[in-house]
Regions:
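Core nucleotidyl-transferase/polymerase catalytic module
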Residues: 1-137
Length: 137
C-alpha cells in the first residue's frame, strides 16, 4: 500500500489530468473550486484520535469522493513507470502489450511477461529512491 506516502507532484498530476477531461464550460466555471479542493487535499489538517492536530502533505486521504478513482489512475501510472524502470534496455513497448493488470485503488493484480528474480528488493528500492515512497515488501 502506498497511498500515505504518495508524492504531492504525482497526486496533483493525476488530479489535473482528470480535471482536463471535464466539460470545458464546467472546467472554466468551477476552476476556482477545483483548485481550492485540490490544495486542501495536498495540504490538510487531520484531527487524530488523541486530540492532536497534524498537517499532512503527502498521500491521498481516504473518504473523499474520488479516492478510489485517483488511486486507480495513480496505480496504473506507477505500474507503467515501474515496468519501464525494471526493464531498461528491453523492448518495453512490445513487452507492455503482454502486460495486464486489475487495479482497485492502491491494490493490484498483474501478469507480466518478465519478472526479475530480485523483483521485490529492486521495486521497493525504486519506490524509495525515485519517489520517496514506502511500499510494503
Amino acid at each position: 500500500r502506498y497511498d500515505g506516502t504518495m508524492p504531492r507532484a504525482l497526486f496533483k498530476h493525476i488530479k489535473d489530468l482528470r480535471w482536463e477531461k471535464m466539460n470545458k464550460n464546467h472546467r472554466e466555471r468551477y476552476r476556482h473550486v477545483h483548485d481550492w479542493y485540490v490544495e486542501n487535499l495536498l495540504t490538510r489538517y487531520v484531527l487524530m484520535p488523541s486530540g492532536e492536530v497534524t498537517i499532512q502533505r503527502r498521500g491521498n486521504p481516504s473518504g473523499q469522493i474520488s479516492t478510489t478513482m485517483d488511486n486507480n489512475m495513480i496505480n496504473f501510472w506507477l505500474q507503467a513507470f515501474e515496468f519501464a524502470y525494471l526493464n531498461k534496455g528491453k523492448d518495453v513497448e512490445a513487452l507492455w502489450k503482454e502486460y495486464d493488470t486489475i487495479v482497485y485503488g492502491d491494490d493490484r493484480l498483474s501478469t507480466t511477461p518478465c519478472l526479475p528474480d530480485d523483483y521485490v528488493p529492486r521495486v521497493v528500492q525504486m519506490y524509495k529512491e525515485v519517489f520517496g515512497m514506502w511500499v510494503k515488501p
